Curated annotation (Swiss-Prot):
Cofactor(s) needed by this chain: Zn(2+)
A Pfam short name: tRNA-synt_2c
Membrane among keywords: no
EC number: 6.1.1.7
Keyword Zinc: yes
Localization per record: Cytoplasm
GO aspect biological process, one term: alanyl-tRNA aminoacylation
Protein name: Alanine--tRNA ligase
Molecular function per GO: alanine-tRNA ligase activity; aminoacyl-tRNA deacylase activity; ATP binding; tRNA binding; zinc ion binding
Keyword entries, A-Z: Aminoacyl-tRNA synthetase, ATP-binding, Cytoplasm, Ligase, Metal-binding, Nucleotide-binding, Protein biosynthesis, RNA-binding, tRNA-binding, Zinc
InterPro entries documented for this protein: aa-tRNA-synth_II/BPL/LPL, Ala-tRNA-lgiase_IIc, Ala-tRNA-ligase_IIc_anticod-bd, Ala-tRNA-synth_IIc_core, Ala-tRNA-synth_IIc_N, Ala-tRNA_ligase, Ala_tRNA_ligase_euk/bac, DHHA1_dom
Length: 905
């Protein structure tokens, strides 16, 4: 069996299938773009899910990928297993080949055999193949079994298993089918190999590849017209097999990350071997952290953000158990970027942001740890003193709520002391807190509702659809939670009238503002709500005089603000219609904000909108505005409105009689004018919007004036958000954009029509100058290093160079060492520098000396105590660190003596 690096495995897999007609497709994000039900991308087929379901057509029928994946839940992906287990991971890479109705088993299995036995040269005598044994619903997969034998497999090595192991389903509906898994025996004694080890817990049997054959429709179990293939091979496991080791952590994917930890600690391999789990956990978690942040996830308290925070903090805690006292994780994540950046460019492109995010989160967690550990230690002592072995849920909750200690960390520390945590009690307190949170969000309004519910009032008559002014009589006054007969100047007040033109906040539309003027004084209205059904309450302050129960008042809504709100509300209806026209009827309203200065519209859609889609939506809305179509409303039964085609918002409660707002619709309540019809025909598309809505609207669409989208973003899985401006606000926004363009054009000395070309030319010029600067910097660095070659010394026949240099980081120090070692040809290089006030020493030996006469690890072990530290490493390369950077010259003077002692000269 040949030995291959992980990079070679990746490339040979992709090239093999590329040569057989497959398109090499880049990895998709860890955040699924087309599946709001999935937290993270957990297999290679996720990005092709819509293709397999027939919802999406791709320009190819064969694909091959290396997909980045994350699994952090489920029986086989318990986070606590990462580290102690030799093969569990959070982040991993999945190699795959896919057929979308192209080839099937008769081509997939021979290709798999050829790749495994001819390209990867896996020993046939160690391979096992499993197929579906069949059941009452699906026949046995005899075809796959026969194809494996025809390809060259020993019939005795083709085993049959049931649905649990060899049948794949996507969901309750959609494609499904049998799968065939390839397992390799990696034990030392072939005589101990047997069929009983396959699909068992025996670590000598490693499943390396699964070939899924989608050939049935799940709901009916009828054969698919176009069966497909989906395969998945874990790169980490394949690297383990092809590098002849028994743990994925011993492969070239993880060794550099473990070595970086040891170097930072000034420890050697024996330290790692004595306690492997924490080092492995840090290595694994660093990869997950790097890729999650690169794909846009930030640490937080919910959803994906919480998963990232949990992984990152677990890595920090594991690091502390082996001696890291200060922030270190960014250094390990930097090693991930250094190692994986060539394969996944997003790591390099976002490196600074990734490292800054990791450092900030780690420092925040260290503050949490320092505050919480003393409390937890006190709890542990108290529990032990009481003779119990269980930390109460109340204490675990306090640690989480007050000190930010996550439950899993409390459980881990408790386990280290032989204790457990009352998880049920903890969850009970958490649920109580969630209930309080839900109540707190509505506490003020709930308390007010209780007050108003105790006041016997008839429903308020709303007159605001037809007017922005009106008269009414004060029915009730509430001040500081109490019903009163009179309120005086300066008091915060809540007032109910028998009739009002003020609109109460509802359906996303904010409440009106304005004034109430009575015979005794004036009230400034700052908000309007319905604390109880049917009753409209004005919230504000008595500006002058007083207001008394039963006073007649004149109610005046801020008409300019109301007009702006109406423009934005009608615009949301036009936007909703345009979204459905452009994206599809699935684009349903999921929330909105209609304010005087802007509108916000949330809708169901799984993908970001393209610039073309946004432009088309905006074009349609503005065409409908120019058409100056009447906006009409009518009250009718709910059933009649639905039959007329009105859209009812999901989750909204409607009465028997509803208000339907219609815009356009030739057969509507008020048909468009001939001019409007001509405008619509010119625009090239009809418009008909009917929605159930109790809000206030403009009389004609032309009153909106102008509509501009200013942002489009994600709110939650499967929910997008558009923010937009209308009328004067939209005009001001456009004016600002034009002013910016004019300023930029003037600054770069180009007319606006040539601005893009000028900016592109400036960018190209900047890049050219940067390249020249980089080349100059590199030449200067080489010149400085070349100068060091003049100070090469000898001990007997061994040449060596020992020097103090300036290096910004460990990676640069190693680059300098590599260059000098190569220039030296034969000899030893010892470089020292200062990072963050601490000494760092690097030793390298050329291949002819390493492990024979010179051991770099032992060399730095001898030098490290001089600078107050420790270190170690391989025979050819080792690093050490120490607290006393002032003694670097002393350590370098000692190099000759150490070399002489090692070489015996």
């Amino acid at each position: 069996m040949k030995k291959l690096s992980s990079a070679a495995i990746r490339e040979q897999f992709l090239r093999f299938f590329e040569e057989r007609g497959h398109v090499r497709v880049p990895s998709s994000s860890l955040i699924p773009g087309n599946d709001p039900t999935l937290l993270f991308t957990n297999s290679g087929m996720v990005q092709f899910k819509d293709t397999f379901l027939g919802l999406e057509q791709r320009p190819y029928t064969r694909a091959t990928t290396v997909q980045k994946c994350l699994r952090v839940s489920g029986k086989h992906n318990d986070l606590e297993e990462v580290g102690p287990s030799p093969r569990h991971h959070t982040f991993f890479e999945m190699l795959g080949n896919f057929s979308f109705g192209d080839y099937f088993k008769s081509e997939a299995i021979p290709m798999a055999w050829e790749l495994l036995t001819k390209v990867f040269e896996l020993p046939v005598e160690r391979l096992w193949f499993t197929v579906f044994e069949g059941d009452d619903e699906v026949p046995p997969d005899d075809e796959a079994a026969q194809l494996w034998v025809a390809a060259g497999a020993d019939p005795d090595r083709v085993l049959r298993f049931g649905r649990k192991d060899n049948f794949w389903v996507m969901a309750d509906t959609g494609p499904c089918g049998p799968c065939s898994e390839i397992t390799i025996y990696i034990g030392d004694d072939l005589r101990a190999m047997s069929a009983q080890g396959v699909n068992s817990d025996d670590p000598n049997y490693v499943e390396i590849w699964n070939n899924v054959f989608m050939q049935f429709e799940r709901s009916t179990m009828q054969p698919l017209h176009r069966p497909s293939v989906d395969t998945g091979m874990g790169l980490e496991r394949m690297a383990m097999v092809m590098q002849g080791v028994h743990s994925t952590y011993e492969t070239d994917l993880f060794i550099p990350l473990i070595e970086r930890q040891l170097a930072l600690l000034g420890a050697d391999e024996s330290t790692y071997r004595a306690r492997v789990a924490p080092y492995r956990a840090v290595a694994d978690h660093s990869r997950a952290v790097a890729f999650l942040i690169a794909d846009g996830v930030l640490p937080g308290n919910t959803g994906r953000s919480y998963v990232l925070r949990r992984i990152l903090r677990r890595a920090v805690y594991q690091g502390r158990t082996v001696g890291f006292e200060k922030p270190f994780l960014a250094e390990i994540v930097a090693a991930v970027i250094e190692q994986m950046g060539a394969v996944y460019p997003e790591l390099r492109e976002r490196a600074d942001f990734i490292l800054e995010t990791v450092d900030l989160e780690e420092r925040q967690f260290l503050r949490t740890l320092s505050g919480g550990m003393s409390i937890l230690n006190s709890v542990i002592e108290r529990v032990r003193a009481s003779g119990s072995t269980v930390i109460p849920g109340d204490d675990a909750f306090t640690l989480k709520d007050t000190y930010g200690f996550p439950l899993d960390l409390t459980q881990k520390i408790a386990a280290e002391h032989g204790l457990t945590v009352d998880e049920a009690g903890y969850e009970r307190r958490m649920e109580e807190q969630r209930d309080r949170g839900r109540r707190a969000a509505q506490f003020k309004r709930a308390a007010e509702a209780e007050v108003w519910a105790g006041i016997d009032l008839p429903p308020t008559r709303f007159t605001g659809y037809a007017a922005v002014s009106g008269s009414g009589v004060v029915q009730a006054i509430v001040v500081a939670g109490d019903q009163v007969a009179e309120a005086s100047a300066g008091q915060q007040v809540q007032i109910a009238l028998d009739s009002t033109p003020f609109y109460a906040e509802s359906g996303g539309q904010v409440g009106d503002t304005g004034v109430l003027i009575g015979p005794r004084g004036r009230v400034r209205v700052e908000d309007v709500q319905r604390p109880v059904p049917g009753v409209i309450v004005h919230y504000g302050v008595v500006e002058s005089g007083s207001v008394m129960l039963h006073d007649p008042v004149d109610a005046h809504v801020d008409s300019g603000r109301r007009a702006a709100i109406m423009r934005n509300h009608t615009a949301t209806h036009l936007l909703h219609r345009a979204l459905r026209d452009v994206l599809g009827e699935h684009a349903a309203q999921a929330g909105s904000l209609v304010a005087p200065d802007r509108l916000r519209f949330d809708f169901t859609h799984t993908r970001p909108l393209t610039p073309e889609q946004l432009h088309e939506i905006e074009r349609r809305v503005n065409a409908w505005i120019r058409a100056d179509t009447p906006v009409v409303w009518q009250e009718l039964s709910y059933q009649a409105a639905i039959e007329a085609g009105a859209i009812a918002l999901f989750g909204e409660k409607y009465g028997d009689v509803v208000r339907m707002v219609t815009i356009g619709c030739v057969n509507g309540h008020d048909a468009p004018s001939p001019a409007a019809l001509a405008e619509r025909e010119l625009a090239g598309f009809p418009m008909c919007s009917r929605e159930l809505c109790g809000g206030t609207h403009v009389g004609r669409s032309g009153e909106i004036g102008l509509f501009r989208i200013i942002s489009e973003s994600s709110v939650a899985a499967g929910v997008r958000r558009i923010e937009a401006l209308t009328g004067p606000e939209a005009e001001a926004w456009v004016d600002a954009q034009i002013a910016t363009l004019q300023a930029v054009a003037a600054r770069v000395g180009a007319p606006q029509t040539q601005l893009v070309e000028r900016v592109e030319a400036l960018i190209a010029e900047l890049k050219q100058r940067q390249r020249a600067l980089d080349e100059l910097t590199a030449r200067m660095a080489r010149s400085n290093l070349e100068g060091l070659l003049a100070s090469v010394q000898s001990v007997g026949d061994i040449r060596f160079l020992a020097a103090q240099v300036e290096a910004p980081n460990a990676a640069r120090l190693r680059e300098m060492g590599d260059w000098l070692r190569d220039k030296l040809g034969s000899g030893v290089v010892v470089l020292a520098t200062v990072f963050d006030g601490k000494a760092q020493i690097l030793a390298m030996a050329t291949p002819d000396l390493a492990g024979k006469r010179i051991h770099a690890g032992n060399l730095v072990k001898a030098l490290a105590p001089i600078v107050g530290g420790s270190g170690g490493g391989r025979p050819d390369m080792a690093q050490a660190g120490g607290r006393d950077s002032a003694k670097i010259p002393q350590a370098l003077e000692h190099v000759a003596a150490v070399i002489a002692a090692q070489a015996g000269v």
